[in-house]
């Protein structure tokens, strides 16, 4: 847990240990407390990624509908195996054809050889010798074009555009893969997220002792900055920081309706095996 807190905050081991003790082992509370006290460097937004596998995308011929599926394996070696990759492509194609994103229902879909997705998964498990799981799927439909991008088989993004074309969509999807915005525009940030950010800002050291009107002015400025940082349209475009994503899309006569971003293993905590301890325990009988 100390290691994870260090990775997410960039702080030293002793500082992280102390923060975890004070937060009774609650890592999210520890990060909030460290930010409030002004200790923490910018906390990394991405959750810890532990599980292996791949993200695969399938798009219809008109490029107006796309499905993205995350399928997990136990090791990165298997995630690069041709049998695994072939299975991923078949699952995505079947999900697209049926317009399905429910994992249980995807398992019931028929493949071209007549077997179900679940039967094919079980056969793959027997052949490869690892646990293979279809974890989640996302689907987008666009009035204009769908933008799709998969980075290294591990990060997948779908963009639904109103107007525009696939090339613009791919550019925006690459940006989302790299920068990981929270929402399309600032007005979509959930109220609870906004309130939590306000609470953290109010508790920061430079707010202490200032008149209420000054605090509110500073709060407003910092909240506006936060909203721009997490909103896709307000972010500097990753391929040309001199323009924003919003300006890029507007210049093309398009709008971003929505996006989906999947990262392999996101939110799954992988068990860390201490092989030295295992050997020692085995030696002791």
Curated annotation (Swiss-Prot):
<dbReference type="InterPro" id="IPR014039">
    <property type="entry name" value="Transl_elong_EFTs/EF1B_dimer"/>
</dbReference>
<dbReference type="InterPro" id="IPR018101">
    <property type="entry name" value="Transl_elong_Ts_CS"/>
</dbReference>
<dbReference type="GO" id="GO:0005737">
    <property type="term" value="C:cytoplasm"/>
</dbReference>
<keyword id="KW-0251">Elongation factor</keyword>
<dbReference type="InterPro" id="IPR009060">
    <property type="entry name" value="UBA-like_sf"/>
</dbReference>
<dbReference type="Pfam" id="PF00889">
    <property type="entry name" value="EF_TS"/>
</dbReference>
<comment type="function">
    <text>Associates with the EF-Tu.GDP complex and induces the exchange of GDP to GTP. It remains bound to the aminoacyl-tRNA.EF-Tu.GTP complex up to the GTP hydrolysis stage on the ribosome.</text>
</comment>
<feature type="region of interest" description="Involved in Mg(2+) ion dislocation from EF-Tu">
    <location>
        <begin position="75"/>
        <end position="78"/>
    </location>
</feature>
<dbReference type="InterPro" id="IPR036402">
    <property type="entry name" value="EF-Ts_dimer_sf"/>
</dbReference>
<protein>
    <recommendedName>
        <fullName>Elongation factor Ts</fullName>
    </recommendedName>
</protein>
<dbReference type="GO" id="GO:0003746">
    <property type="term" value="F:translation elongation factor activity"/>
</dbReference>
<comment type="similarity">
    <text>Belongs to the EF-Ts family.</text>
</comment>
<dbReference type="InterPro" id="IPR001816">
    <property type="entry name" value="Transl_elong_EFTs/EF1B"/>
</dbReference>
<keyword id="KW-0963">Cytoplasm</keyword>
<keyword id="KW-0648">Protein biosynthesis</keyword>
């Amino acid at each position: 847990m100390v290691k994870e807190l260090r990775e997410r905050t960039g702080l030293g081991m002793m500082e992280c240990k102390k923060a975890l003790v004070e937060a009774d082992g609650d890592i999210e509370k520890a990060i909030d407390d460290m930010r409030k006290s002004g200790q923490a460097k910018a906390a990394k937004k991405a959750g810890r990624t532990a599980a292996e596998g791949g993200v695969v995308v399938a798009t219809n011929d008109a490029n107006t509908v796309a499905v993205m599926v995350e399928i997990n394996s136990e090791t990165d070696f298997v995630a690069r195996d041709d049998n695994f990759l072939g299975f991923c492509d078949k699952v995505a194609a079947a999900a697209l054809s049926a317009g399905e994103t429910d994992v249980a229902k995807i398992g019931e879909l028929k493949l071209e050889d007549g077997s179900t997705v679940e039967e094919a998964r079980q056969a793959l498990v027997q052949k490869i010798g690892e646990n293979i799981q279809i974890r989640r799927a996302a689907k987008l439909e666009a009035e204009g074009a769908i933008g799709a991008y998969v980075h290294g088989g591990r990060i997948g993004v779908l963009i639904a555009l109103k107007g525009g074309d696939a090339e613009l969509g791919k550019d925006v999807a690459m940006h989302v893969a790299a920068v990981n915005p929270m929402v399309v525009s600032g007005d979509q940030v959930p109220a609870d997220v906004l309130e939590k950010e306000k609470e953290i800002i109010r508790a920061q050291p430079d707010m202490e002792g200032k008149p209420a009107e000054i605090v509110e002015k500073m709060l407003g400025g910092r909240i506006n900055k936060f909203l721009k940082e997490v909103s896709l349209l307000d972010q500097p475009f990753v391929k040309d920081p001199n323009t924003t994503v919003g300006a890029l899309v507007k210049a093309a006569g398009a709008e971003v309706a929505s996006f989906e971003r999947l990262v392999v293993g996101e939110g799954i905590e992988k068990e860390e095996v201490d092989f030295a301890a295992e050997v020692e325990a085995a030696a002791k009988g």
